[in-house]
């Protein structure tokens, strides 16, 4: 297919961004246990913010490397500014990468629109002293969650309220959990991550990076809700069990931070509440921390050297890429 100079440049940029981001996404998943281990002494909230930031960073870094290095290098070396035949495989790869991003953005916009419509069906709020945002009662689902983006609301199901499933003290701790989600803008973070495509690598022992972030966000909200109080930790554990018994399988696609969004995390969260792990990694094992830092510096230096080598040979490689198929 014949394409003009600027369309060739657009295809090349799309392919470069897509390939680099996928490689960075795969690398992030591979090193995610090392990141979590390295941040062990920093606390749950620091881990949550790091996992959120690194997922955004894979896309930003892919764009920066493409537009600051690869595209200018191609423009400096390219002499043909007229139409040129481009391979169909290259065009298909560029179209697939564009569709990957477009699908993610469309999915996020759809969920946002459904959340707005769901908000409009809520009745009048009622007062709970512990709540920092308006509280509403819903028929069934979600049992207890923070719903919304710019003006989030806490929703509680009638089953939890009318059947007295939760004592007042337990309800206060659950509300404190949702208050933490509201203060840390976890729904906004979820929307931003939903706007971006993810490779979604996972195994039975290691979930995807997105799921790891979601689990860390819940653990961080648990910690904010209970603080150092063993009594509040027990109350929140009991609340999680009560919510698990009332959770419906008919999940609506809305922006929400539910008290128990993933039932498979129930055991892990209860273990963290009842048997918190002391944060002694930085003090007790400085040698291991030094080895990890040295390894990270080595990997980073190797990646920079490899990328510099690719940039130096980028024009002939880009020509081969453009003529695939």
Predicted feature residues:
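Short helix/loop segments within enzyme catalytic domains
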Residues: 27-28, 32, 114-120, 207-268, ...
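Loop-to-transmembrane-helix entry motif
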Residues: 53-57, 178-185, 277
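Active-site His/Glu-centered metal-binding helix of metallohydrolases
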Residues: 175-183, 220, 224
């Amino acid at each position: 297919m014949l394409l003009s100079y600027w369309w060739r440049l657009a295809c090349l940029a799309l392919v470069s961004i897509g390939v680099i981001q996928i490689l960075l996404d795969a690398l992030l998943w591979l090193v995610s246990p090392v990141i979590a281990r390295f941040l062990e002494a920093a606390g749950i909230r620091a881990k949550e913010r790091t996992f959120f930031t690194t997922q955004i960073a894979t896309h930003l870094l892919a764009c920066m490397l493409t537009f600051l290095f690869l595209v200018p290098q191609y423009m400096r070396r390219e002499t043909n500014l007229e139409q040129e035949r481009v391979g169909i495989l290259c065009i298909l790869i560029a179209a697939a990468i564009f569709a990957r991003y477009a699908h993610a953005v469309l999915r996020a916009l759809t969920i946002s629109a459904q959340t707005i419509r769901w908000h409009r069906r809520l009745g009048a709020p009622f007062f709970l002293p512990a709540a920092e945002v308006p509280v509403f009662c819903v028929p069934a689902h979600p049992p207890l969650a923070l719903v919304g983006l710019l003006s989030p609301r806490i929703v509680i199901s009638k089953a939890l309220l009318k059947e007295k499933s939760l004592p007042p003290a337990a309800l206060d701790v659950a509300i404190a959990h949702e208050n933490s989600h509201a203060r840390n803008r976890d729904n906004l973070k979820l929307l931003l991550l939903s706007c971006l495509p993810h490779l979604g690598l996972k195994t039975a022992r290691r979930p995807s990076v997105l799921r790891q972030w979601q689990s860390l966000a819940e653990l961080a909200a648990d910690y904010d809700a209970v603080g150092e109080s063993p009594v509040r930790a027990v109350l929140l554990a009991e609340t999680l069990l009560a919510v698990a018994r009332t959770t419906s399988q008919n999940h609506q696609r809305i922006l929400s931070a539910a008290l128990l969004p993933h039932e498979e995390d129930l055991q892990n969260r209860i273990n963290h509440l009842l048997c918190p792990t002391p944060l002694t990694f930085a003090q007790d094992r400085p040698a291991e921390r030094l080895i990890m830092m040295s390894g990270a510096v080595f990997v980073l230096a190797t990646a920079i050297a490899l990328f510099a080598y690719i940039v130096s040979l980028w024009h002939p490689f880009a020509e081969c890429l453009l003529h695939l198929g």
